[in-house]
Amino acid sequence: MSKVTFRERARYWFDNTMSKGTASLIGWLAVVSVGLIVLVTVLTLWLAPGEPEGVSNVGEVLWIALMHALNPGRIAGDKGSIAYMTVMFAGSLGGLFIVSMLVGLLANGLKEKVDRLRRGRSRVVESGHTVVLGWSDQVFTIVSELVKAQSSQKRSAIAILAERDKLDMEEQIRETVGDLGKTRVVCRTGRPTEPRDLALMNLAGAASVVVLSPEGEDPDAHVIKILLALAKRKGAHPPVVAALASSRNIAAARLAGGEEVHLVDSDDTASRLIVQSSRQSGMSVVCMDLLNFDGGEIYLRTPKKLVGITYGEALHAYQTASAIGLRRPSGVVLNPPMDTVINADDQIIVIAYDDSHVRLAAGKHAVDEGAIVMAESEPLEPERTLLLNWNGRAEQIIRYLDGYVSPGAVLEVAADHPKAGTNLAGLRNLTVNVKDCDTTDRFALESLGVGLFQHVIVLSDDRFDARHSDTRTLMTLLQLRDMQSTLGEHYSIVSEMHDENNRALAEVTEADDIVISDTVIGLLLAQLAENRHLADVFAYLFDSRGSEIYPRPAASYVKTGTKVTFSTVVEAARRRGETAIGYRDSQARNDPPHYGIVLNPDKSEVVVLGERDSVIVLAER
């Protein structure tokens, strides 16, 4: 091996010095400038002594050389011998080069500084803020809902950490969400799985953390890695809410995140909502109203005045709020038996538009006994359901549907997906038939005999990207709508879509329910980030066990076409062992944003319910 020469060492040292950035380069430029000034001074004293006229010492010559180096234009005003003019001209040329280099270095250094700021690498100094880790379409729903939830606060903040450009994130949020009110949205570029990047978010001072499931393959692995990074941190650990795509990864995620993490199973939640919506028209709209911060919200209250009375009596206790259940030491129960006595350690679960609306009524509500109808519940009969298209959650949807229907029910699966109808062993009530079908083709749909079915579920085909899949779903819905109009067929339609912006287009099809799974999960994450104590309530709502939300014919509760107060509707439902929380006006079923659904009306509000209207209740199947 050859010996390193002095020249190589010097060059190596010089290269390392030059690579240290703008400050080092400016330092070298200063050295060159000093050398140039000294050289010009020496040459002037040697070749043109006594010039310019009136200069008597070395210091004055140094000053003149410095001025020529900094301002090359001074050469135009010089007078003297050829030697003096030549030296000054050379010094001015050298100065021109140095000044040009200096301007370039300063501009480049400023650009680098701006780029660093643009990348968003400074530490967040907020406190009591909500931290969002990761990026997906759900981030817009979450930010929008948190802005509404925190609108009453003087100062609130949302900090987002994702592997995206800071300015791009901020611009997308401004364009999609719009007015942010008093809430500051702070974006930082980094990897949520890296402890060093997590340190930028001031997690110790955060109120809650939301972990998003990213797009692409195996998103749960990414979420679990983030949970591990959060658990490894030292210091305070704020509550964490995380979304997982598959139920199979719940155990691993719980082990990684620990007790402070609440996990949302995206596929499971969306599957349950699709099944419930397919059987109870308007279910998705009710859930959206309960999950967002625009309509009715869920509150927990411990009113001492209600201790000792029954749950049935408590249904009439509030004027502008609706009791829906109890939170007991043993757990949450919605629509408990009407004779359940409220204990001192129980909390009443109510729906109200605002915290200030949760107040006890001044007196008893008037009930029109003559308007109450005691109709018997209709027995369950075997149903026929048509499932169009196939995706990864179709199997789960079918298994949940199997738990709802009575024995002898039929499910027809029509899709050209290679996995359609697979892995369905062990069904108890459903008989499943599978047909190969292009669900966008009118003749193929007509050959299915759609009019023979009571319910139609249109899934999003996972072989295509979200945008194209939604386009195909819209085509299918339009075909079904035209078939209903042309052939006079009647069946409920629930459809799954990806993009919330396509809901407005889908309204033309007059589908009974449009389930935007990403929006539902985003709303649920935002609710749990703000109200972690409601996790058990929402879990109960989406569970097939116990009471669920049902829109049932108004004629089964009160006389139709008659003016009645909503308290009369509540009493009619109470006598059936059900909790009434609202009604649906059939004439407004296609009018956004609530599609005819009125939740939590004032108990004294007078309503006239028609034959096609529904009462929305919490009831057992």
Which residues does each PLM region occupy?
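Cytosolic regulatory regions of ion transport systems
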Residues: 1-621
